[in-house]
Amino acid sequence: FILFTIPLVYPTNINWISSVDFPPTILNGGTSYPPSNDWLETLEWIKLNTPEDSVVASWWDYGYWISTVAERTTLIDNATLSDWQIQKVAEIFMSTPDEAWNLLTTWNVDYVVVYVAAQRLDGDWNGDSLYVLNGGGDESKKSWFMRIADVELSKYLESNTNFGTNYFWNETLLGKMIPYNTLLYYNEETQQSYDIFQPGTVPISIQEINYNDDGNYPLKLVHTSPSFTNKNIERFSAVFVYEVNKN
């Protein structure tokens, strides 16, 4: 049995001087989490470290930031009127990694960006920090990805929850791009933990990068924003940039 205490006070991670000209949504990614420099830092990285003719895929929420701040072409953004195009991007994220790679290369996509919100818990597992997801990033928006892609929800979500199934985490591009692995399922009321999902439990995760740069993967992680590795903040969001492996 494991008991987790949810912290009540959360430090922030931000340089206010560098962000004064930007809207609040870009500082917290549209979540209720504390503002940070993660999006601004990532957009600057994209602008300075990717070819000017690069095409970047992300969910439409962030497309406008990528096109205006990072000055890179995106597949969809807030102004996209084509339902078909938005559906195709949702299908990319919900496809198997191999199927998604075929779609990405067909669309000449060079980079894929995902955004994840998490909360670090007190305690650890063999030295690894523990996390709860579902904070308002793509890990929470995935149910909309699924609906727009018109896939069978029961295959991807545990019953009556927004928690991903093993199939989602292991067989979809989005699941593999979110750098967390479900360790156990915890029932706060009974203080019991389980290896498989049970009604009333919450997934507890550890950080785990699936697409690093030392394997033959469809993507490779080329940039993580600062909050992902900052152990001094509890509630945070982070941005991840993956490069499409064209070989």
Language-model features: where?
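Extracytoplasmic
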Residues: 2-247
